[in-house]
Amino acid sequence: MAESRAERKARRALIEAAEGSEEKKSSKKSKSSQDAKGKSAKGKAKAKRPGSRRNEDKASQTRSKHSHKDRVSSARKAVDPKSPCSIMKSCGGCTALNRPYKKQLTAKQAAMEELFASLCEREGIAVDPIRGMGVTLGDPGKYPAPRGFRHKAATPFAPGKEGAVRCGFFERGTHKIVAVPECPVEAPGARQILNGIAREAERLHIPAFNEDKHLGLLRYAVVRCGWRTDQVMVTLVTAQRDLPHAQEFFEAVAALDPRIVTVAQNINGRPGNAILGEETRIVYGAKCMRDQLLGCEFDISPTAFYQTNPQQTELLYQLAIDGMDLHQGDVLMDAYCGSGTIGLCAVKDAQKKGIGIMLLGVERNPAGIA
């Protein structure tokens, strides 16, 4: 049943009220903390004798000690064992991982309703409930938080002390790397492969790339994990083609996980933050990995576009296909098609219904058409 405008406004008001309550509590805590600090500072100011050089020297030493302690404390606070992810506060990735999944979906629903408010009012329609992973907003019961759904993982590399190779995520708002032992939203094993690449590069004295000095070799690594096939493809991005102990390095990377079917090397010697360069070559295994969506099998090359969350991709594609309302003889153009996933899935769906259509795929990157 379509939700009325009044009902939508009422629900949005409840959401805003709940969020406002949380902000108010946070504001009160912050104010209380500031008041306490202010009283403490006044007390210290009274205790200090005017004109005492000794007190000033001691205060300077104390500030220096506290400054060092604060830096150490700040580094420790970056790791929160109670969070779903121990490095969530410092990592530049997830921002809502510690919120209950139902609240995440509710926030998305409110955002979509606000975005399409004028259209819905003009056309007399409503935004459908958000369809999450394994649950639709409004369903009764629990909303289990999804984990391990990102089937593409990547890392930058940076030089550490004494030839160390550092990897992980960029700290929020910086280019400082935060080490990542594991990531709860990535496919199982993906982060272990990336960390293993850093260890093997360090063992074989392959230097990490320094983006400030533009020196070094190993820049990035990308791991793509199949959803239905359980195959894994690794792409190593280097500043130049030639590497010390290259073959040994490639074979060591391939041995990190028995699921790895392809190791590719991409050469990117250009300055800047773009991950991939124009040249890619296969250095181990097959030229492509394989995965399946909606019953269609796809060959995926190292530089081809492929959706990161296959489970939601199937849901998204099926919604789009159902909305196409295809008929016999229709021509379907899949623009910027990458591997052609949505177009080919639409053709297969039409064939199941006995409908014959023509598919045209348009893609600029030849490697995308595996």
Language-model-derived ranges and their functions:
Residues 215-228:
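Short edge beta-strands and adjacent turn/loop segments
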Residues 198, 202-205, 222, 321-325:
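Generic structural signal for well-ordered alpha-helical scaffold segments
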Residues 78-81, 89-208, 228, 243:
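Extended interfacial segments that mediate partner engagement and assembly in macromolecular machines
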Residues 3-30, 35-38, 42-75, 244-370:
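Rossmann-like S-adenosyl-L-methionine
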Residues 2, 71, 82-88:
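N-terminal cysteine/histidine-rich coordination modules
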Residues 148-171, 223-225, 281-282, 287-293, ...:
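Short beta-strand elements
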Residues 158, 223, 230-239, 297-301:
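Short, aliphatic-rich beta-strand segments
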Residues 151, 230-232, 329-330:
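Nucleotide donor/acceptor-binding cores
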